[in-house]
Amino acid sequence: MPDGELRHYNYGEQADAGSFYLSSRDHGLTWRKVNSPRDMPQADVASRVSGEYVRLVNMWADGVYCIRTQGGPKGNRTVTKVDSIGSIMIKPPVFARDGKLMIVAAHGGEKGCYTYVSDDDGLTWQRSNTVVTPPHTGGGFHKGIRWNHGAVEPTVVELTDGRLWMLMRTPHDKHYEAFSEDGGLTWSEPRQSRFYGTITMPTIGRLKDGRLIFFWCNTTPLPELATANGVWDDVFTNRDVTHVAISDDDGKTWRGFRELMLDPMRNESDYALRGGGIDRGMHQAQFVEPEPGKIVAAIGQHPLHRAIVAFDTDWLYETERTDDFSDSLRNWTTFNYIKGIKGHCSYNRINGVELKAHPDRKGQNVLSLRYDKADSLVSDIRGAVWNFPALRQGEFTASIRLPEGAEGHTMVLNDRWMNPCDTVARYEGIYILPLSRKELGIKDDRWHTLTVEWDVDRPSDKAIVRVDGRRRKIKLPMSNPTADGISYVHFLAEPGENDSLPAPLFIERVAAKQRQPR
């Protein structure tokens, strides 16, 4: 609002009862509930030209309408028909050409997305061509076909060269992108973008100082089951975390790739049904920048999963992170799915690992990771996934103990979140290291410091492995290319030889930091 107030409106598919909004006057740190008339403008955007507030709304069979104030929020409003066909997930207006163009992204109809464009401050509108992406066809690790909903939930930003950039949700492994050179009236053929993300909504925007910021789920779901026929999604398995990245050069390079928030319900045995069997998880985000570099974001679906989060963009430039389990498993993804789809496209979960008291240090915990056979689970492979700032040249260190009989453990360095139980990570990860005594040259039950050093800008140079500072003969090839560096470690625990139940791998501390290019 002009006086600095932030408002978060209560409306839409999962709105609480009543007509109200949340108000903050301290840049999103504290909020209070304010009751409001039902006919009050909601989450409208102020025109840079006139200051009037504008919003496009879907009236389903009646089509799309523009609601525009006359004299600001307390004045009158005009309602103008924009389209005779309804649209879904209509986004707030984006301004281009120094505010002279309003662009509103939406989707509907032909399993595609498009934009509405106004060059007269929201009085009249034109609709662009429809952007359509190819269907998911299965194959590879998939036994079925992902929900082929087409290109939907687009997000748009103006680039410094005048083009508009659209990123969209699709059923593929990565978000697709398209570009417009005429202010959003026509869009190019879509292509795969650099950003991983499947059946989740992206959000991009420009900050006050010109930087771009991107919110999305940098995640890959489990391979599709044979029951998935492409008509509807049977279960969502990649909506447990929202990520953020930032660009200083108009989208050419990106930094961060940080987990903004992990779903606090992610390990719950009644995950699928608690609070009602409706959409849930951490996908979908909106943001504002009340002060330069200070971001307030609303993320997630479902009252028990969504949250308002405030952060400083400096956090996205950090180049190291550590964890010693002093916060328990707060920063880790460790769940397994229980068989049986419940509620709206969900599985219930269990925590697939254990925290145990450190045998040598009072008050400290260690992670115990071992395979444990369980027919009740979608997959009984156990895993632990941890995020750190994306590093093109980096070093990952873990203090580990491999007791006699520890088998079936693998460490994957990756550029995205994958399910803890997903062994596809061994094939699609960037660097893969078997964690065996023989491989690492470990001959006792003591704690050892394992280090891996990499440089993704020199793919012919294999990653170096050290144990207790001593370089091992083993070198890790780059198994797959990465656009933005390594930002995840993924520990896997699979059955031992002859399907035996092996001893656990113990982890007491992990750390990642940037290295200088070689």
Q: Language-model segments: which ranges?
A:
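Asp-box/BNR beta-propeller blade signature and adjacent active/binding-site loops
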Residues: M1-L329, I338-I341, G352-L355, K373-D375, ...
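Beta-strand-rich interaction surfaces with strong enrichment in secreted/lumenal proteins
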Residues: R191, R382-F388, L435-I442, M478, ...
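Extracellular beta-strand elements of beta-rich domains used
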Residues: F325, L505-A512
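Extracellular glycan-recognition surfaces and repeat-rich motifs
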Residues: R330-L369
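Secretory/extracellular carbohydrate-interaction modules
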Residues: K362-S436
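Short tryptophan-centered beta-strand motifs in secreted/extracellular beta-sheet-rich domains
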Residues: A398, R446-D457, A463-V465
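Short, aromatic/His-centered strand-loop micro-motif at the edge of beta-sheets
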Residues: G429-T451
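Flexible glycan-contacting loops in extracellular carbohydrate-active proteins
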Residues: I474-E508
